[in-house]
A protein has these predicted regions:
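Long beta-sheet-rich domains in secretory-pathway and surface-associated proteins
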Residues: 1-226, 231-232
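Helical hinge/lid and interdomain linker segments adjacent to catalytic or ligand-binding clefts
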Residues: 236-315
């Protein structure tokens, strides 16, 4: 048998080196424990999202990263192994592992996150009157004992009322802050930006599917405020959902009453109360029951109703 000895483990990102000098026994799991202080490191933002995208193009400062499918590991370790008289070094990333009772061992990249994230509930708010609207900001703590001052910065012509001070005592604790926003006639279109303790804050978005590693990114905490002078006709709209669009929320923001319907709601006695029916984005492409739904909607049109079909693709 070949004698194998692990001499030390190190990490340049952590500025850490741990001397082991221990012989490894054949077919025996060796657990090595050590404590270290993690220095301040950049958050785990996908490299192509570090700068704001511009109409589908991305700005990447480090040209060597272009084409790489994912970020290099946030933290890597090196271990020096001695085989008799030969010495080799192996590198391996720090990863998070958990045991699932059904799927077995699951791995995901080690993520460095901000201490606090702030997610605004909608990407855009439309105002068609001077009536106030509620904007919800969800604060989440990634470590214990976090408190601070929340600040919302809006363009000229907008007034905001909200609680500024907050406390998050435990890791993963969440707090929803409701801000009341009112537009004036001089309100300018622009971004509502979220600051915590004077610093621009980031949100947290997660993509989690079984067939790919979990993906996270940290967009700027902000939403768009738009004041438009709209002359509305009608009040009540029926909406049949399409491919993940957010049109219903935007219509509600400008004062329409929106009901989300499915096929069981399409009786003529029910549809007659609506001023219009709106089909969601690519509804005709993705809804397998569209061939059976459309005759009911066209009958509604024959009876004097208004049907609006949004974007669809041709096959």
């Amino acid at each position: 048998a070949v004698n194998i000895e692990i001499e030390f483990i190190s990490s340049s990102e952590l500025r850490y080196e741990f001397s082991v000098n221990k012989k490894l026994e054949p077919n025996t799991k060796e657990v090595i424990s050590s404590k270290f202080i993690v220095p301040t490191l950049p958050i785990s933002q996908p490299y192509w999202l570090e700068e704001k995208a511009n109409f589908g193009t991305y700005n990447v400062n480090d040209q060597e990263l272009i084409g790489v499918p994912e970020n290099p590991p946030a933290i890597t370790f090196k271990a020096r192994l001695k085989f008799e008289e030969d010495v080799i070094e192996i590198s391996f990333p720090l990863v998070h592992k958990k045991n699932d009772p059904v799927k077995g061992e699951l791995y995901r990249p080690f993520i460095i996150a901000p201490k606090i994230t702030a997610n605004v509930d909608q990407p855009i708010y439309l105002f068609s009157s001077l009536a106030p609207q509620k904007v919800i900001i969800k604060l989440a703590s990634n470590t214990d004992q976090q408190k601070g001052v929340l600040e919302l910065k809006a363009p000229e012509g907008w007034s905001l009322v909200y609680d500024k001070e907050f406390t998050l005592e435990k890791k993963h604790q969440e707090l929803k802050v409701t801000a009341t926003i009112t537009a004036s006639k001089e309100a300018k279109e622009g971004l509502l930006e979220v600051f915590i303790n004077g610093e621009k804050t980031r949100g947290l978005n997660t993509i989690n599917y079984a067939h790919i590693p979990t993906q996270v990114w940290f967009p700027d905490s902000e939403t768009k405020l738009v004041f438009v002078d709209i002359k509305k006709k009608g009040k009540k709209i029926a909406y049949l959902l399409g491919a993940g669009d957010v049109v219903p929320e935007s219509l509600r923001n400008i004062g329409y009453d929106i009901d989300i319907l499915d096929e069981s709601d399409l009786g003529q006695d029910n549809l007659v109360k609506y001023d219009a029916i709106l089909l969601g984005m690519r509804f005709l492409n993705i809804n397998e029951r569209a061939d059976f739904i459309m005759p009911k909607l066209l009958k509604y049109c024959e009876n004097g109703g208004n049907l609006i079909v949004q974007y669809n693709t041709a096959h």
